[in-house]
């Protein structure tokens, strides 16, 4: 930011790996965990890094935008889908970053459809603190999984009707 004319800093892979049970951070956790659960400690590690970067970027060039591409599902929602979530699986607390003003925009990777898309994109908007939320749509799934064009068009319509700031492809 100090040496280049940039418009933004984007964190694409700002998370722990999905093989969290095998991630080699036992020693660091013992030294620095301070009574927190490992999940909370990991979330805090990422959040501290994001916060330091955001604060430094804004100190140097307040107009530069800071964003990330978290997993498409922020958190588990009652009765809706299972599997990976940003908050519980890879320790991205992007909702917190938005609520505390440490992110200007989110581009969640929403490569799902139907019940795994609609409630989760609405949850991102709710977590977004009126900041920019632009879901990445899984148009590649038309080839890889045989999604129809209508699947994507329905997602575009939904985002337009629910205060979403656009779509990313």
Q: What is the predicted function of each stretch?
A:
Residues 34-41, 111-120, 128-131:
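Generic structural signal for short, solvent-exposed loop/turn connectors between secondary structure elements
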Residues 33, 63-82, 121-155:
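Active-site clefts of carbohydrate-active enzymes
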Residues 37, 125-128, 160-163:
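Generic secondary-structure transition motif, activating predominantly at the C-termini of alpha-helices
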Residues 1-103:
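Polysaccharide-binding and catalytic clefts of secreted carbohydrate-active enzymes
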Residues 94-117, 131-169:
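Substrate-binding cleft of secreted/luminal carbohydrate-active enzymes
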Residues 5, 62, 129-131, 163-164:
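Short glycine/proline-enriched coil/turn segments at helix->beta-strand junctions
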């Amino acid at each position: 930011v100090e040496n280049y004319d940039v418009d933004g800093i984007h964190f694409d892979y700002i998370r722990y790996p999905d093989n969290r049970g095998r991630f080699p951070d036992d020693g660091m956790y013992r030294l620095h965990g301070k009574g927190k659960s490992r999940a909370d400690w990991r979330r805090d590690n990422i959040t501290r890094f994001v916060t330091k970067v955001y604060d430094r970027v804004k100190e140097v060039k307040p107009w530069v935008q800071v964003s990330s591409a978290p997993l498409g599902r922020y958190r588990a929602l009652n009765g809706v889908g299972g599997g990976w979530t940003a908050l519980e699986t890879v320790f991205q607390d992007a909702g917190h970053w938005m609520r505390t003003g440490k992110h200007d925009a989110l581009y969640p990777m929403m490569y799902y459809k139907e019940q795994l898309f609609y409630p989760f994109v609405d949850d991102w908007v709710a977590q977004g603190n009126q900041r920019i939320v632009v879901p990445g749509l899984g148009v590649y799934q038309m080839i890889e999984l045989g999604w129809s064009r209508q699947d994507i068009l329905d997602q575009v319509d939904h985002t337009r009707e629910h205060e979403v700031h656009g779509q990313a492809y």
